[in-house]
């Protein structure tokens, strides 16, 4: 016997590398290339540190209300957590306490099975089609819950509002969790379905489209009943998850709609141009509605290309995982960064041709 | 069947009321009456919001190293979490996965049994003596872990380094978690025992003695092995729990030792003076080594006094709980605030005498 016998064994998630090379082009963790709204800078400059001696609002009250107004929901339909990973984690713990399996696509955010391992939630991976498309019919079976990222990661592909509605209609006895971390880049949010379904929970984040990865703000929207259960869970885990400054920063970002729309549409334009160039170079590219693309070249081994890019100080993401080991995920940076990537790929492919 | 059947039921913690009265004297949640170090103000003013588009360091690398240096430990002996509540929560989940009961004092931080409920950890409350003192012998029995707040909350009473060593020596097959949230106000930290015991985990916080309740920084210290397990757990729950600004603020606070010592010693002086005055008024007062006092008046019902104080806009804390329902916990504020409390109590007791 030893204290080690009482440890709970887990298989932790491995986050994308935070490489620290100088002059690198960092396209591996889907960070936004543009700074947050100037309102954020202002709110930080104006912040009086005296306030920090006091506890923050336990439910980020002002921000919660602002988010409700923004999305035309009631305040009690909004939950705020310490980044969307925490929101997902607490949601899994709250809603998926069943002996029936949680259903999820076989290719999706790799944190989902880790939460399942942590909380002993049985789960079943539902294979996507060969083209990574999702068939809603495969979710019409007994389950203890459903989690789908829409748009999906790392494929970037989205499903329609109607498809989500079909899943909800056929699963009214389970929570259907739709992870909309990337929704602002072109997908269609299913928030309007909250009017019809009390078993829908939608998770979003401030980090990608609002350039606030550094501040950790994640959100869940749902029926007042579901959200109340999520708060009960949060209050069993940590009373004050969101610090005072983060709350203010979230409010400031939410108030600057013009900047938000502008920076999101810049990224979408860059993505579409980047996609066209990739296709010209012979890449296969999924129809991404996110701030990244998922790409494959029939003539190039993905691991080899990943390494070549890395040596050129262009950091992208690759998974040594069945079905996607031939693919790379590339975050959309600035036009300039993406042009550098295209120039590199042109050279790389040209040299490769020569060596045949 | 409905989705409600799959909910995990919990009994959430209820935090001290964040009353929003004007001109109130808020002495109910142990917040520090003094602002944080001026270095904190400076680091906020100098912070460039552009940095927020990037993820924070997953383990608050720089702050982690600074804390290790500060406490003469190795970096791998330091864990940083989103407030000490999160650190405690993850520690319970990591270390107390046994069928034998976790031992804790019957009167202690009321979040402990809530974590146990959440994670299905069996626990056994060990009664403190009538004077709220802790007998180490009662912890020499089979267990799946031990958690003791030192100084204890809400009694404020501390145990000695030697007593903790005895507990460790007799429980080498369990993690002994010492919660030192209030240690800076006069208790003796057991960090030096880390040299001898790999089953000791010590939790501290930035919020009380460093006036940073608003920023959410909690810390665990332990053997490199124990801390590695805690990080595995954290990485199964949330990759990036500490935002970039909080990391910088923590560093700034840690660097200003002079201010830290000064504000802590001011609070200790105020506490000792306040205690003397209370004793003069006939109160029974525990030997608190914290930034609060725990008091009882033989002639006054605690609930009645709590309400009278509340009406005078002096907010303190009371628990309707066996053994302590006759007691009030009063946070140490400024000298001026504590004088106001004493003046109120003098009047109150005088009027009470009259009404006999």
From Swiss-Prot, chains A, B:
E.C. code: 2.6.1.9
Keywords tagged on the record: Amino-acid biosynthesis, Aminotransferase, Histidine biosynthesis, Pyridoxal phosphate, Transferase
Modified residues (N6-(pyridoxal phosphate)lysine): 208
Pathway(s) the chain acts in: Amino-acid biosynthesis; L-histidine biosynthesis; L-histidine from 5-phospho-alpha-D-ribose 1-diphosphate: step 7/9
InterPro entries: Aminotransferase_I/II_large, HisP_aminotrans, HistidinolP_aminotransfase, PyrdxlP-dep_Trfase, PyrdxlP-dep_Trfase_major, PyrdxlP-dep_Trfase_small
Tagged with keyword Transferase: yes
Family: Belongs to the class-II pyridoxal-phosphate-dependent aminotransferase family. Histidinol-phosphate aminotransferase subfamily.
Protein name: Histidinol-phosphate aminotransferase
Organism, as annotated: Lactococcus lactis subsp. cremoris (strain MG1363)
Lineage summary: Bacteria, Bacillati, Bacillota, Bacilli, Lactobacillales
The gene coding this protein: hisC
């Amino acid at each position: 016997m030893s204290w080690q016998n009482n440890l709970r064994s887990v298989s932790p998630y491995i986050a994308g590398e935070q490489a620290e090379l100088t002059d690198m082009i960092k396209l591996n963790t889907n960070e936004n290339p543009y700074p947050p709204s100037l309102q954020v800078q202002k709110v930080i400059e104006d912040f009086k540190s005296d306030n920090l001696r006091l506890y923050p609002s336990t439910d980020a009250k002002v921000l919660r209300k602002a988010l409700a107004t923004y999305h035309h929901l009631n305040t009690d339909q909004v939950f705020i957590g310490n980044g969307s990973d925490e929101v997902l984690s607490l949601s899994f713990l709250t809603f998926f306490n069943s002996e029936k399996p949680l259903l999820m696509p076989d290719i999706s955010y790799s944190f989902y099975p880790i939460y399942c391992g942590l909380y002993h939630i049985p789960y079943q991976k539902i294979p996507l089609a060969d083209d990574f498309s999702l068939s809603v019919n495969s979710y019409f079976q007994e389950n203890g819950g459903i989690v789908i990222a829409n748009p999906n990661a790392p494929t970037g592909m989205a499903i329609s509002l109607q498809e989500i509605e079909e899943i909800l209609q056929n699963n009214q006895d389970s929570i259907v969790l739709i992870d909309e971390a990337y929704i602002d880049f072109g997908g269609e949010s299913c928030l309007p379905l909250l009017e019809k379904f009390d078993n829908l929970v939608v998770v979003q984040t401030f980090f990608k489209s609002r350039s606030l990865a550094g501040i950790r703000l994640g959100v869940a929207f749902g029926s007042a009943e579901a959200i109340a259960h999520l708060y009960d869970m949060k209050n069993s885990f940590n009373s004050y998850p969101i610090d005072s400054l983060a709350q203010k920063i979230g409010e400031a970002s939410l108030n600057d709609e013009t900047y938000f729309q502008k920076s999101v549409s810049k990224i979408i334009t860059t993505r579409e141009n980047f996609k066209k160039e990739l296709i010209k170079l012979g890449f296969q590219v999924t129809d991404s509605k996110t701030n990244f693309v998922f790409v494959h070249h029939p003539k190039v081994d993905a691991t080899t290309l990943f390494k070549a890019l890395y040596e050129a100080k262009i950091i992208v993401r690759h998974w040594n995982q069945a079905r996607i080991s031939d693919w790379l995920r590339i975050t959309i940076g600035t036009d300039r960064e993406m042009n550098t990537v295209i120039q590199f790929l042109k050279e790389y492919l040209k040299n490769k041709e020569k060596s045949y």
